[in-house]
Amino acid sequence: MSLRYYIKNILFGLYCALIYIYLITKNNEGYYFLASDKMLYAIVISTILCPYSKYAIEHIFFKFIKKDFFRKRKNLNKCPRGKIKPYLCVYNLLCLVLAIPFGLLGLVYINKE
């Protein structure tokens, strides 16, 4: 994994972490159930491991797809961007949520190479 790939994929995790920190600091109603230290540590760890998680998920996914998958399905490349964007957001959010287990898996795989 290159530094460029890591920086490109950590931006979504940083964005989510900054939104979380902003929301817990601007909470005027006294609901601080999400503002625990353990939750903050988990979000910071997930932010750091998010690119590794995405790398591991992509590696596992492409291991099971045949090489001619995208050649046979040419309509996938002609799909409008507006229809793909919600799925990309859900995919990035899934990578962030699963960042700790899959991120550690990605780290193990990278160190193995």
From Swiss-Prot:
One of its GO terms (biological process) is bacteriocin immunity. It comes from the Bacteria. Keywords: Bacteriocin immunity, Plasmid. GO terms for molecular function: toxic substance binding. Pfam families: Microcin. This protein is able to protect a cell, which harbors the plasmid pKY-1 encoding colicin E1*, against colicin E1*. This is Colicin-E1* immunity protein. It comes from Shigella sonnei.
